[in-house]
Each structure stands twice: as structure tokens, then as C-alpha cells.
Amino acid sequence: MEKIQKMISEKSVVIFSNNSCCMSHTIKTLFLDLGVNPTIYELDEINRGKEIEYALAQLGCSPTVPVVFIGGQLVGGANQVMSLHLNRSLIPMLKRFGALWL
């Protein structure tokens, strides 16, 4: 948990992802298309990726990828992010935490 806390405190938007996950790809594309430059951790490529995935599960993230943190706060997975986007809450949230300026 401590490692995750350190990782999410480094940037406004952090995405925990997996290269082989289509929903991870969708969420990364959404943020990039919005003009956000998220920090992306590919759990299938980094050291201790399985440990981090286990810690995300302990936080209640299911499935464990993709998982998005904005402003150091857990937003959730693809369903939660897409819901925020569709109800027009995502962009104001990104602006509030300095991840988006326009």
C-alpha cells in the first residue's frame, strides 16, 4: 500500500494498466484524447507488478486493471471513469487537480 501511495502522489493522473487489457487501452486513449498526460504503470511490465495488482485488489479494485487515480484519490476502473465522462464530471475533476487546463 505504501508503494501505491508513493506512486499516486507523483502525478495528477495515474493509471495502473496492463498491455493485454482492451479496457486499459480504452481508458488510456480517453485520457490522451482529452489532452491529459497521465502517468501509466503497465503492471505486466514493471517490477513487482503482481504485488501492486494485489494491493489494488485490497483497495477494492475489481478488476484490478485499469485503475485510475486523480489527485491522489481512487476514481476506480473503466466503468467509473466512463460514467464520470458521460455525465460530464471527468473534465471538471481533471481541471480541479491541474491535469487539464483548457
UniProtKB/Swiss-Prot annotation:
Subcellular location: Cytoplasm; Nucleus
Keyword Cytoplasm: yes
Pfam families for this protein: Glutaredoxin (PF00462)
Residues involved in [2Fe-2S] cluster binding: 21
Gene Ontology molecular functions: 2 iron, 2 sulfur cluster binding; metal ion binding
GO cellular component, one term: nucleus
Top-rank taxon: Eukaryota
Keywords: 2Fe-2S, Cytoplasm, Iron, Iron-sulfur, Metal-binding, Nucleus, Redox-active center
Signal peptide: none
Domain Glutaredoxin: 1-101
Entry keyword Zinc: no
Motif residue range(s): Responsive for interaction with TGA factors: 99-102
GO biological process: response to nitrate
CDD domains: GRX_GRXh_1_2_like
Cystine crosslinks: none
Family: Belongs to the glutaredoxin family. CC-type subfamily.
Purpose of the protein: May only reduce GSH-thiol disulfides, but not protein disulfides.
Descriptive protein name: Monothiol glutaredoxin-S8
